[in-house]
């Protein structure tokens, strides 16, 4: 009898051990906890964090005035200067010892912010924890930020591609994700129209806790400045003046 019991017990113990190992090595539970856009935008807290990430893309090299390290604007005159050596030093700008890689993070951050804002605009309506007024305000803020990122890009790089407002799939090939550069007028027209839409839903003032968020006045001010720059032949050369920037045309002959 003992001879029969021992193999049975051994098999049971091994079976339990294999089962427990199988449960331990299973990764299915991690995928169940993984965030999705639907989970994020059904939560008020996560939606607010997503909007905060959009604002976060305005930091560092996208700020007009900031601490010495990040903004090259601080080197425009002698009012402020920092250490004479280091990652971004006063002497490097003073003696022209810099290249285009020093501030190219701005391009990446702007398109990151554009993508974040577009995703919020497309998905925030499913949130049942936010009021209709809050949803309208969040969408307007995201719309303002998306347009403002294009304004920053236009000022620094001239005409840039206007990417589709729907989310671009990262599974596509290079051709499907490659978009041609739009003309100067097309980019400004987009900024102008989007800022008008944003201004319609943005408040004129915000409380002290939200004082740094977009307002109606901010949207209209950016629109006015973009249109002012567009009217200048220095920033936006016209066909009637072909001598200026004639080498900076695309394959269709557009400046």
What positions do the PLM features span?
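A solvent-exposed, charged loop/short amphipathic helix patch at secondary-structure junctions
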Residues: 238-254
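Aromatic-lined, polymer-binding surfaces characteristic
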Residues: 210-220
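Hydrophobic helical h-region of N-terminal Sec-dependent signal peptides
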Residues: 10-14
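Bacterial Sec-dependent N-terminal signal peptides
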Residues: 15-42, 191, 224, 239
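Conserved, well-structured interaction surfaces
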Residues: 42-62, 66, 83-157, 176-211
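Bacterial N-terminal signal peptides that target proteins for export
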Residues: 1-8
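Short coil/turn linking the two alpha-helices of tandem helical-hairpin repeats
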Residues: 154-155, 161, 229-238
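Proline-centered turn/helix-capping motifs that create local helix->coil transitions or kinks
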Residues: 21, 25-26, 62-63, 80, ...
